[in-house]
């Protein structure tokens, strides 16, 4: 009986790890890894950006106001003036990340959208693809 119980516990833990939040509570682990590798150098690990130079992603009003443009922004970059949380940014060009797949962009957007007190709706790959169609 003890052996069967142990097998059940191990199997349940494996299923939870594969489909659930995992032990760290981070549902968007791939998005977090991609963010760290491609975005955090400028936007910082905390999503706060660099005051006056690089806009924050944490608690950002820009994310909701420009949702339809975000997939293109990640793929192709951003140039020119933008206003985030009432502060104008116009000094640093954000380079696009052309090598990210549609799925990876979706994961990055879901990570950003649910981190640092951002509470945006979850992105789907179809929504990202529709956004990317607009900027081809």
Q: What annotation goes with each model-predicted range?
A:
Residues 54-58, 79-135:
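Axial heme c-ligation environment in periplasmic c-type cytochrome domains
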Residues 1-10:
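Bacterial N-terminal signal peptides that target proteins for export
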